[in-house]
């Protein structure tokens, strides 16, 4: 949402606007400040925020006339549905739909604090978009794929979040998920858009050529720019590397067959 308020105040009063999710991540999230002028005035925050409630901190002497918000979302309609005889699962599906909706912006992203897409997250959300949204929703996945390959480094490394500004570190396992069966190839399964596959295939092939096998014919671990495979303890990195590499090769093989390479 973009929060809105209408007040009557003297000049120079500072109003703070944030949501209850402002401290919800590892870093503080977005907020807004408004400095009043004399008289009756209204203000709508320029940047969208996400949370369960909007918190306005109003200085003494400011008369609040009205508060509100404008909901913003990606231009898509929800065509998929799920209904069963267990209300728990019906509610769970609606919550999942709402979460997906909140993550669909000009990129697939966490609306609390991110303004670019982590592609490991995009793999998960894109699978939901194919089930729940109309064709406009699928266009967001196409854009995400194009963003990923457009930001490929000269040495073949793929990384996210993209579009990038202050980050260029590869998370290898996430990139395998991105280019593989449940990432880029899943887009083709649900759209039949072979033109996009033809466009991105060379980038996927170039990236996977960076991965090598050891003397046991298991994939060699790549540390990338951020050596992170999963949350928690006792992470079986070797299993994860080989499982995601296998799925990535399956996606690449499907692309090659489609394109006759």
Q: What do these predicted ranges mean?
A:
Residues 1-110, 121, 136-142, 159-166, ...:
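Extracellular/oxidizing-compartment recognition motifs
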Residues 14-16, 79, 122-150, 198-209:
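Carboxylate/His-rich catalytic cores and anion/metal-binding grooves
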Residues 28-32, 38, 105-111, 155-179, ...:
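The feature captures the catalytic groove of carbohydrate-active enzymes
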Residues 42-45, 83-87, 113-116, 132-139, ...:
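Alpha-helix capping and helix-loop boundary segments enriched in small/acidic/polar residues
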Residues 52-55, 97, 126, 145, ...:
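Short, well-ordered alpha-helical packing segments
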Residues 93, 97-108, 139-159, 200-219:
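Long, well-ordered core segments of solenoidal/helical folds
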Residues 124-135, 179-196, 244-261:
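Well-ordered alpha-helical scaffold segments within catalytic/enzyme domains
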